[in-house]
Amino acid sequence: MARLNFAALIVIMITAGCVSDVPQMASDGKPVPKPYFLSQVEPAIIQFRMLDGVNALRQSRDADVVNLNASLTAAAATHARDMSVQDRPWHFGSDASSPIDRLVRVGYSGQLVGEVISETYETELETLAAWMTDEGARRIILDAKADELGLAWHQEADGKIWWAMVLGASRTPQVRITE
């Protein structure tokens, strides 16, 4: 009996080593993405990765850097969760709120520069790269008026991530008069 158990153990060990790591393919012929679970990463790390990425892109275009803003992040968090509830990536809340409405609700005293959103399984930097390929999103991210940023997300159990990034301008534009 011991020989049989030992033989079974050997067979199991050998076949376990034969498991192929061939990626599962989607209907479009591309590998099915492996979910990136944000719960395994500290939220501040994700926010600072995105902030660093945004600022590197802005500096490469001679735009000033932006800083994280808690009010903008609160507005982004509300919208990321709401997009998930609606199962729809768009700029209006389930209560018909606009990005401006959400900034008013969180008490942001600056001006909205823009909001960029995404429904994806991608990391924060992959999402930023995708946003940079979209003319409208790129224009918001690089807008020289922006000096503050809020970033938030909501992740579903299957790994789908709803990203929302809001850029704002806290400073009053300077008017220069020359003679």
PLM region spans:
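Sec-dependent bacterial lipoprotein signal peptides
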Residues: M1-A16
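A well-ordered secondary-structure block
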Residues: S98-P173, I177
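Short, surface-exposed glycine/acidic/tryptophan-bearing loops
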Residues: D21, A26-D28, T73-E122
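Bacterial Sec signal peptide processing site at the extreme N-terminus
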Residues: I12-Y36
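Well-structured core secondary-structure elements of compact alpha/beta domains
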Residues: P31-P35, Q40, A44, F48, ...
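Short, well-ordered surface patches within globular domains
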Residues: L38-I100, L149
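Intrinsically disordered, low-complexity segments enriched in small/polar and acidic residues
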Residues: A26, S39, V175-R176
